[in-house]
Swiss-Prot record:
Listed cofactors: Mg(2+)
Activity modulation notes: Inhibited by the Calvin cycle intermediates fructose-1,6-bisphosphate and ribulose-1,5-bisphosphate.
Domain of life: Eukaryota
Cofactor info, note text: Binds 1 Mg(2+) ion per subunit.
Entry-linked InterPro entries: A-D-PHexomutase_a/b/a-I (IPR005844), A-D-PHexomutase_a/b/a-I/II/III (IPR016055), A-D-PHexomutase_a/b/a-II (IPR005845), A-D-PHexomutase_a/b/a-III (IPR005846), A-D-PHexomutase_C_sf (IPR036900), A-D-PHexomutase_CS (IPR016066), Alpha-D-phosphohexomutase_SF (IPR005841), PGM (IPR045244)
Protein family: Belongs to the phosphohexose mutase family.
The protein's name: Phosphoglucomutase 1, chloroplastic
């Protein structure tokens, strides 16, 4: 038997519809319902009791359902039913429900990583695929995080999220969860899920997203679980999930109907409830605590400051207008691609210079705005642009940290800074200048989460357009945009109308003059054949095994070659094989990684970095400045020989 999201009640229950209205019409209706139920063997006294109960609840709409089961009648609801006696916005559903054990067998390929489980939609739609994983998750959690618990559910609005929401709700109820808080229409950005978990003191939450990967019937879907701190589940849990997927035998599901996710309110099913919530409210409340919204509003309503935000038809479309327009006063036409769509409008919701082409053309066009930004599928990534100026993600996190005094949340100072290993060393120099603890971690936000929970990190970032702070335990696209607007506003706080604006480019160049510039670029080769990509990595590992300090690579002298490993200073866990590094004596670096965030094939990422202190060279194009290192990287790796690729899919 395969689990079906459409199953709303056990098959041995017989439905019959009754009216909740009073008066003569109600009496006639009740007589008809009694006759109908009698045909199913329900006693007249049971009918009378049930219909009396229905009438006493002062139904505000039709649609109550009486389920006849072995001569007993109990209340359920096939359609949404509002009941005044239960309080405004409360939707009363069955007083109880049955839990069904659905037999199942293990399904291959459910290995769960840092970003959860990501596959093609069709795979998730296959019988029991998602249900197996959800049940395996519940079987992996401590009892106190399941029985009677409160969990958050949200996603980026991509195709299959609505169906998946119903599956998750029913299995949650079947496993004894007490309450699900779900964003309206099943929508909530990844950082908002983290914020809601923390604000509502939930035991955890589900994020339905494949992040920046394309959406639609032929494309990607994903799911992950975040813990009570709001951060992605640690490997101790994800490893258990995978282990349980290999031995699963049953799925526990509740016989409840699909929940209407379009309207705010509480749906009660006995001691289990589903509350449909505004996915923006808790998140916006948090942002108002972090930033000076009056300062931000002053800039965004200024006649000589123009702002553009590309929501890429992704989840931040649900947040952009309430935050930027309604709360901060930006013109409504500041937002474009602002309606979340299941297929992201046919686009690739990855905020970089390639996939956010529409924004890039605006920001590099004639009469360009002063500030442009974009966010990705689930709202955790960001891209920042000035007028004809691009801020690399590596520079972005460094510049935010260096200008933290523009953000009230940091008024007591920064606790520490952290970056992922492939991210440039720009943040390192800020940490040194400010005398702050600094951490270099593997790629994956969970490593930052451990540092944050231990009070050791305030600001962190990844070169993959992820920036954030300890206000939540996920990277946060809108937070990064507001951080940058805060910096621009703070730099212009004493500016009089008509005076020259301190621009994004001015802020970047001022930073480089003080700290030097880390030229940085990333080459992505997407959906390479895994066999060739793995052979390339083995080839590189053979090279580093034989390498020694002083080896020459063109004009560069090797300082260190290794496969990055990390021992977590908080929990002592060790992560190995996190990226192959060639570090040269002048601080330049070449790094190779295989990315695991796609749903098919392998993505090879090559990172190149060179530090430059000479201000006369800071305006060089990054590709020109880095060309010698890029040539070395391609030659040493033999990428074309192993993969057949002659050019990257994306250059950042």
């Amino acid at each position: 038997m395969a689990f079906s999201a459409a199953a709303s009640a056990s098959t041995n229950l017989v439905p019959a519809v009754a009216s909740g209205r009073g008066g003569a019409a109600a009496s006639a209706s009740q007589h008809g319902e009694t006759a109908r139920l009698a045909r199913f063997g329900v006693s007249s006294s049971a009918c009378a009791n049930a219909l009396s109960l229905s009438s006493s609840r002062s139904c505000a709409s039709m649609g109550e359902v009486l389920w006849a089961n072995g001569g007993a009648v109990r209340l359920a609801a096939r359609r949404t039913l509002r009941v005044r006696a239960a309080g405004a916005g409360t939707i009363v559903q069955p007083e109880g429900f049955q839990i069904t054990s659905v037999p199942t067998t293990p399904i291959d390929g459910q290995k769960t990583g840092t970003s959860g489980l990501r596959k093609k939609v069709k795979e998730f739609q296959s019988p029991n695929y998602l249900a197996n994983w959800i049940q395996a998750l519940f079987d992996s959690l401590p009892a106190e995080d399941v029985k009677g618990s409160t969990l958050v559910l949200g996603g980026d609005g991509r195709y299959f999220n609505k169906e998946a929401s119903q599956i998750i709700i029913k299995i949650a109820a079947g496993n004894g969860v007490g309450k699900i808080l779900v964003g309206r229409e099943g929508i909530a950005s990844t950082p908002a899920v983290s914020a809601i978990i923390r604000a509502r003191k939930a035991n955890g939450g589900f994020v339905m997203s494949a992040s920046h990967n394309p959406g639609g019937p032929k494309y990607d879907w994903g799911i992950k679980f975040n813990y009570s701190s709001g951060q992605p589940a640690p490997e101790s849990i994800t490893d258990k999930i995978y282990g349980n997927t290999l031995s699963i035998k049953e799925i526990k599901q509740a016989d409840i109907p699909d929940v209407n996710l379009s309207e705010l309110g509480v749906h009660k099913f006995g001691d289990f409830s589903v509350e449909v919530i505004d996915p923006v409210a808790d998140y916006l409340n948090l942002l108002e605590e972090v930033f000076d919204f009056d300062l931000l509003k002053g800039l965004l309503t200024s006649k000589d400051f123009r702002f553009k935000f590309d929501a890429m038809h992704a989840v931040t479309g649900a947040y952009a207008k309430p935050i930027f327009v309604d709360r901060l006063g930006a013109p409504e036409d500041s937002i474009f691609n602002g309606v979340p769509l299941e297929d992201f409008g046919g686009g690739h919701p990855d905020p970089n210079l390639t996939y956010a082409e529409e924004l890039v053309k605006i920001m590099y066009g004639t009469d360009a705005p002063d500030f442009g930004a974009a966010s990705d599928g689930d709202g955790d990534r960001n891209m920042i642009l000035g007028n004809h100026f691009f801020i690399t993600p590596s520079d972005s996190v460094a510049m935010i940290a260096a200008n933290a005094d523009a953000i009230p949340y940091f008024k007591t100072g920064l606790k520490g800074l952290a970056r992922s290993m492939p991210t440039s060393g720009a943040l390192d120099r800020v940490a040194k200048e400010l005398g702050l603890p600094f951490f270099e971690t593997p790629t994956g936000w969970k490593f930052f989460g451990n540092l944050m929970d231990a009070g050791k990190c305030s600001v962190c970032g990844e070169e993959s357009f992820g920036t954030g702070s300890d206000h939540v335990r996920e990277k946060d696209g809108i937070w990064a945009v507001l951080a940058w607007i805060s910096i621009v506003a703070y730099k212009n706080r004493d500016r009089k109308v008509g005076e020259k604006l301190v621009t994004v480019a001015d802020i970047a160049k001022e930073h480089w003059a003080k700290y030097g510039r880390n030229f940085f670029s990333r080459y992505d080769y997407e959906e390479c054949e895994s066999a060739g990509a793995n052979k390339m990595v083995e080839h590189l590992r053979d090279i580093i095994a034989k390498s020694k300090k002083g080896d020459k690579y063109g004009n560069y002298e090797l300082e260190l070659a290794d496969d990055f490993a990390y021992t977590d200073p908080i929990d002592g866990s060790v992560a190995t094989k996190q990226g192959i590094r060639f570090i040269f004596s002048d601080g330049s670096r070449i790094i190779f990684r295989l990315s695991g965030t796609g749903s098919a094939g392998a993505t090879i990422r090559i990172y190149v970095e060179q530090y430059e202190q000479d201000t006369t060279k800071h305006d060089l194009d990054a590709q020109d400045a880095l060309k010698p290192l890029i040539d070395i990287a391609l030659s040493v790796s033999k990428l074309q020989e192993f993969t057949g690729r002659t050019k990257p899919t994306v250059i950042t």
